[in-house]
């Protein structure tokens, strides 16, 4: 490790990581309601001299993009983390909004996915700023909204035109894992339509719920045409995640004497690199069309994204992500990991179960930004579990590795970050 890196790492303080993550825990930021935490972060960065863009991704909904400006000529690096958090589960044994430190475990709702990672990327920039080291390239800290809705904040950021030469997304996949592969996700609504009428006269009625039972059964038999990925053996896979039936598109549920004329299921499909949404729809229709052809009363419709009336729905498709492990940004993080820990990363590439998810790297890569996933994990694998926590030691390690990465990347020329095949 060189003296410059050692100087910067001397400004990484685990206590400050705990304090910042704790402050973020105290601000609830469920999807679509990230603005309070965005304003908090904007104030945090402004007080420390960063260039701050409080970006409005839709009316009244904000996300914070902070930049530590370089001196010029160097490659730019984005560290990306989302401010939205998962739904609150019911069996917490602690107050989910009061941070609790027990040994190496910091508890609090949202710290796992992913306010612990947010604290790490922010304190990465702070370690560099406070050391007095000036990077040649810009270091962008993107605190984005709406990742759990398909990456709405990062998508909006790309639509705004911002680009960096490389990026790291600090999802909670482990401080010893460099993840370069994930599945794709598409959410859809499938509707069946019937004809309503009173229970006293069922002639001429069609029960949309009954028709949906046949649709669900057919969906269980969908066979996706794809090239298998041995590293993602469970996918592609379809799940019917919710069902609602009633009268009209408001799904009136309080008139059970009447036949329901609308039924909707919400379907999730996780798919592998090489598949497209068009492929998936064709495979689903190939299962459902014969059903409709054999039943004149069965009418179905597929809607992507699900209707706006389903609050918090996933509005964007997240395509599969497959970054070459020899990409310069991947190798830069690997070098930094070795320099900081004196060891080899436990894994580079596909890491299960983490690669079975999807995340904001899909939008960054689609915009041409080489990237990977590297962030602090927890003792458990499910970000929605009760009593969620993050390991402070993981936050500390990630911060140190990313600080070393920024020193490496931002002193290079932008061309040095291009994929070998693009040179």
Label the model's feature ranges:
Residues 1-2, 186-423:
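Metal-dependent amide/peptide-bond hydrolase catalytic core
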Residues 2-107, 130-135:
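Acidic/His- and Gly-rich active-site-bordering loop/insert found
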Residues 50-54, 177, 349-350, 371-372:
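A short linear hydrophobic-aromatic micro-motif
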Residues 58-62, 174-175, 356-358:
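Short acidic loop-to-helix transition motifs that present clustered carboxylates
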Residues 77-79, 142, 166-168, 241, ...:
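Hydrophobic/aromatic beta-strand patches that form the interior of the parallel beta-sheet core
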Residues 86-102, 181-191, 335, 339:
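Acidic-glycine-rich active-site phosphate/pyrophosphate-binding loop
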Residues 86-88, 151-153, 175-178, 224-227, ...:
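A short, acidic/glycine-rich surface segment
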Residues 106, 112, 116-221, 230, ...:
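Fold-level recognition of mixed alpha/beta catalytic cores in primary-metabolism enzymes, strongest
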